[in-house]
Amino acid sequence: MWSPEREAEAPAGGDPAGLLPPEWEEDEERMSFLFSAFKRSREVNSTDWDSKMGFWAPLVLSHSRRQGVVRLRLRDLQEAFQRKGSVPLGLATVLQDLLRRGELQRESDFMASVDSSWISWGVGVFLLKPLKWTLSNMLGDNKVPAEEVLVAVELLKEKAEEVYRLYQSSPLSSHPVVALSELSTLCANSCPDERTFYLVLLQLQKEKRVTVLEQNGEKIVKFARGPHAKVSPVNDVDVGVYQLMQSEQLLSRKVESLSQEAERCKEEARRACRAGKKQLALRSLKAKQRTEKRIEALHAKLDTVQGILDRIYASQTDQMVFNAYQAGVGALKLSMKDVTVEKAESLVDQIQELCDTQDEVSQTLAGGVTNGLDFDSEELEKELDILLQDTTKEPLDLPDNPRDRHFTNSVPNPRISDAGLEAELEKLSLSEGGLVPSGKSPKRQLEPTLKPL
């Protein structure tokens, strides 16, 4: 499916049909509809109106972008979009709609919105609208004349941004003030003609990124220092630096010219010497020496001018660094406004106290319930070592502990039958006096039986 982006990516030049939407050559019925004129009012058939406008409006703008132009005329568009000898009959309506939406603007209206008085200084590329255009507007006729120049607003903004970046990346950006002629040479590839170049400058001026001034009959342009900064008016310092830069260029050209003259005198002396014309050779050498002295004097002046410019550039850098330091100090003061050493120490103490409390809580939760008994791990380790040492010794020959025997015998045997249990119970009931037999429970063993009196 065709889109303005695809058409914009197509290379400029060549067969126009190859740069246009697919239906341009494939769908005769649709192209006949698109080449027909618009109805007098959109309300008559809004679907057909919107379909045509949706096709032609993006195509007009993308065609201009692909061609690298910001200025367009109805006549040029009709020639560009000819198809089999026919021209689109609705292009004037399309341009009127783009004007209404603000995507296009009359060149004269754009100039009136910006201070363009400097353009009249010997630059006769912009003229007032012809009288018939003015009368047609006064009478309410909104038709676009075939020769009237319109400006694509968005394309002009893109071109202005391109020129600004081109300047920023060039050696001319070493100082914000530059000669208009030098800037025009720099932008020769970006701006196809002089009128486009001046429109771009007007757009940059409208965005407050450049200002134009005439100095000694020559126009100079001052740029803003940063991409988001606003340009300041041209002051005496800017003019002085510009004059120094012009002097540097003039001296450099003069030195180059004198160097070529000195070399020419040297060649003349060599030829005269070969021809045996000694006096002529001496005169040529004297002229060479005089030229070299002039070159030395010009070099001294050039060094002085360059030294002054270097100091100015260094001072500008120092000013930028100073401003950065000043901004940094202000930011630090603002960020440290409520911070003091006492507050910092108090905050650290609170953090330490909270950390200690957290450690105590963690230890308490990790210890669990101990029934009030605290065990010393070191003492337990010592006792365990003693027990391990005792196991290596021979056991003592001691009598059996009756309590152990009684306790062992008192444990019921799960294998005893019911008859055995009854016999055991009978023994318990008949036993009187003395200690309970060894087969009785440990509790009864510890209770002596009293004899009757």
From Swiss-Prot:
Its main location: cytoplasm. Residues 243-312 form a coiled coil. Residues 1-22, 392-453 are annotated as: Disordered. The gene is CHMP7. This is Charged multivesicular body protein 7. Residues 10-22 have a biased composition (Low complexity). The modification Phosphothreonine is found at T408. The lineage of its organism: Eukaryota, Metazoa, Chordata, Craniata, Vertebrata. It holds the Pfam family Snf7. ESCRT-III-like protein required to recruit the ESCRT-III complex to the nuclear envelope (NE) during late anaphase. Together with SPAST, the ESCRT-III complex promotes NE sealing and mitotic spindle disassembly during late anaphase. Recruited to the reforming NE during anaphase by LEMD2. Plays a role in the endosomal sorting pathway. Belongs to the SNF7 family. Residues 392-407 have a biased composition (Basic and acidic residues). Keywords: Coiled coil, Cytoplasm, Nucleus, Phosphoprotein, Protein transport, Transport. Interacts with CHMP4B, but not with VPS25. Interacts with LEMD2 (via C-terminus). One of its GO terms (biological process) is exit from mitosis. The modification Phosphoserine is found at S232, S410, S417, S431, S441.
